[in-house]
């Protein structure tokens, strides 16, 4: 499971700049998805072979009367408490402040790995001008410039060092094949705990032992109709003896970790409220991680026909990037519509791990070009020659040819539709990458 790094500090010290610096390598992955809402407070980052989740906790603004704890939002406090390591960002140019002392006091009491980063330190003599920050009692001060990218790699290495991480490739290899890792995601009070407890109470769910569970993560392995599942905690699962039950608890950290460690995500939407900003952010994170997804609209029994139409329309307009997902209308309390969910979950998992042969992909590509050729862009008309699979979970198709940088988004969607129909890719995102061949005569022509 990916570790979580929380960026903490008072306002305007450069946390957002550092966040953007750490996560910018991931932005290109989701740039092609129309309508995607990206929450700028959390994202994925990678350094070397180590991937991690970054959370920008926002600014701490303690007031004189209540102090820091009244001003800290509940989720912010929880995110910091649940993070694996904290990067405390201070302003090297402004120097130490009373707010910095308050935050440092809170972090010392928290007692978890913490790295102190003095931002905006470009051009400074680290030793002389940063010595005052030792007063915070958090050890060594590390000079960085988030805006210029100075000292960032060393900072991340220091932050991840106490966690003794294994390489991401090794972690992926340890996943037991044939087990569908399922996360139930959704905002607070959407009915996650009710649905999970309903599932856990079914006689058809038979628990089995699963070796090598990930660190500190509560997950429930079970079997249903011959298929093994592992339910990854997002709702606050707790163990009572040999029995698990879910409590209604929302944790950003747990949700993000569960999504990235799952194969399939069941996204719950509240029918009484429709799609909210938080729903869209969670959906965006699911897509960013390339996870298969099934949408379930809960509390369907509690709304009238007019509200039902509004909910359906809000899903179409606010989650257009998930139109590949199957949608179910359910009531967890009345156990209505729950049975078909399992078939859709299995279908999404199968689609995400679909194997596609090069001859079939190339045939489909050439048939698509013959049916509708890509538009010419100025002097150039893209020539699509052959295709092959570049990965699974999610499926990646790589198309080779010439002048492929001129392929339009509309044509890319046209190709995606053809591939999805042929391989029945329901419930999974897919990615199409274009690789243009270099012109061997280009240099000679300009010589």
From Swiss-Prot:
Binding site for GTP 2: 186-193, 233-237, 298-301
Residues at which GTP 1 binds: 9-16, 56-60, 119-122
Keyword field: GTP-binding, Nucleotide-binding, Repeat, Ribosome biogenesis
Entry GO MF terms: GTP binding; ribosome binding
GO biological process: ribosome biogenesis
HAMAP family: GTPase_Der (MF_00195)
InterPro entries for this protein: G_ENGA (IPR031166), GTP-bd (IPR006073), GTPase_Der (IPR016484), KH_dom-like (IPR032859), KH_dom-like_a/b (IPR015946), P-loop_NTPase (IPR027417), Small_GTP-bd (IPR005225)
Assembly description: Associates with the 50S ribosomal subunit.
Its biological purpose: GTPase that plays an essential role in the late steps of ribosome biogenesis.
UniProt entry tagged with the keyword 4Fe-4S: no
Name of the protein in its database record: GTPase Der
CDD domains: EngA1, EngA2
Residue span(s) of domain EngA-type G: 3-167, 180-353
Keyword set includes GTP-binding: yes
Annotated family: Belongs to the TRAFAC class TrmE-Era-EngA-EngB-Septin-like GTPase superfamily. EngA (Der) GTPase family.
Domain KH-like: from-to ranges: 354-438
């Amino acid at each position: 499971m990916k570790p979580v790094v929380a960026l903490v500090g008072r306002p305007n010290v450069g946390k957002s700049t550092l966040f953007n610096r750490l996560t910018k390598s991931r932005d290109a992955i989701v740039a092609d998805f129309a309508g995607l809402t990206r929450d700028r407070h959390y994202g994925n980052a990678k350094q070397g072979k180590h991937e991690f989740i970054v959370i920008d906790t926002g600014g701490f603004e303690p007031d004189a009367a209540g102090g820091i704890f009244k001003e800290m939002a509940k989720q912010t406090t929880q995110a910091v408490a649940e993070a694996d390591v904290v990067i405390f960002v201070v302003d090297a140019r402004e120097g130490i402040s009373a707010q910095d002392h308050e935050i440092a006091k809170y972090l010392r009491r928290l007692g978890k790995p913490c790295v102190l980063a003095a931002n905006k330190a470009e051009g400074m003599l680290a030793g002389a001008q940063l010595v005052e920050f030792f007063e915070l009692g958090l050890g060594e001060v590390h000079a960085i410039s988030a805006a210029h990218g100075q000292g960032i790699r060393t900072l991340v290495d220091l932050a991840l060092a106490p966690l003794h991480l294994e390489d991401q490739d090794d972690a992926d290899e340890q996943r037991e094949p044939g087990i569908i890792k399922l996360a139930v995601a959704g905002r607070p009070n959407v009915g996650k705990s009710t649905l999970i407890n309903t599932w856990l109470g079914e006689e058809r769910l038979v628990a089995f032992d699963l070796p090598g569970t990930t660190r500190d993560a509560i997950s429930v392995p079970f079997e249903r109709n011959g298929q093994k599942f592992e339910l990854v905690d997002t709702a606050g699962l707790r163990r009572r003896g040999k029995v698990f039950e879910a409590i209604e608890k929302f944790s950003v950290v747990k949700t993000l970790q569960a999504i990235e460690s799952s194969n399939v995500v069941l996204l719950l939407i509240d029918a009484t409220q429709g799609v909210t900003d938080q729903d869209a952010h969670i959906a965006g994170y699911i897509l960013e991680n390339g996870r298969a997804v099934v949408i379930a609209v809960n509390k369907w029994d509690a709304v009238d026909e007019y509200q039902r139409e509004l909910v359906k329309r809000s899903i179409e307009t606010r989650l257009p990037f998930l139109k590949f997902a199957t949608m179910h209308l359910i009531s967890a309390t009345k156990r209505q519509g729950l049975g078909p969910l399992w078939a859709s979950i299995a279908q999404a998992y199968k689609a995400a791990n679909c194997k596609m042969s090069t001859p079939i992909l190339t045939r489909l590509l050439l048939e698509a070009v013959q049916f509708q050729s890509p538009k010419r862009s100025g002097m150039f008309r893209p020539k699509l020659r052959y295709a092959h699979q570049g990965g699974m979970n999610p499926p990646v198709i790589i198309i080779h040819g010439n002048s492929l940088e001129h392929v339009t988004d509309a044509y890319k969607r046209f190709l995606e539709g053809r591939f999805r129909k042929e391989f029945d890719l329901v419930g999974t995102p897919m990615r199409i990458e274009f690789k243009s061949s270099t012109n061997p005569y280009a240099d000679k022509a300009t010589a």
